[in-house]
Regions:
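Serine-dependent carboxylesterase/thioesterase catalytic core
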Residues: 2-4, 22-111
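Short glycine-rich His-centered loop
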Residues: 1-13
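The serine-hydrolase catalytic nucleophile loop
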Residues: 14-21
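C-terminal catalytic-base region of ester-bond hydrolases, centering on the histidine
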Residues: 10-11, 84-149
């Protein structure tokens, strides 16, 4: 089971502004995974062992307190709403954007000993369509499923 927390300015708009993440959801489903997407304002509904968050969904993922095997963050935002990664999270991959070019949004930094940071430089809205990052995500999830976290 995988939960995706979408981005968006107000939450409800995530299904429109996070089409790239919904594309990732479809790729995961084709690979046989059960995947549910939530808007960032409904982050408390997430309860899967694998959490993927984009933009506001990425920052909200850091607020989750239940056990998480793998958390993958796509340019979490806003940066000032990021929480240090808790001990409830086994592994984190953060696609940290060095130049999000989105009027102060994007560029969140994941902090914790279990964080692997992948530096990227893309416009914030475009990062969700980056197939090379989606391929990394798919690989990380497959490795976790095989027990190689």
């Amino acid at each position: 089971m995988i939960d995706i927390l979408l981005g968006g300015l107000w939450g409800w708009d995530g299904y429109v502004t996070s089409r790239g993440m919904l594309g990732l959801q479809a790729q995961l489903q084709v690979s046989g995974f059960e995947v549910e997407a939530f808007t960032w304002d409904n982050y408390k509904q997430a309860n899967a062992p694998i959490i993927i968050g984009y933009s506001g969904g990425g920052s909200r993922a850091t607020w989750l307190k239940f056990p998480i095997e793998l958390m993958i963050l796509y340019d979490p935002s806003p940066s000032w709403q990021m929480e240090p990664i808790g001990t409830n999270v086994k592994k984190v991959i953060c696609y940290q954007n060095t130049s999000p070019m989105m009027l102060g949004l994007g560029g969140g930094v994941a902090i914790g000993p279990q964080v692997e940071t992948i530096m990227v430089s893309e416009q914030h809205l475009l990062i969700q369509y980056d197939q090379s990052l989606h391929n990394r995500t798919l690989h990380a999830i497959a490795a976790m499923e095989r027990g190689h976290v």
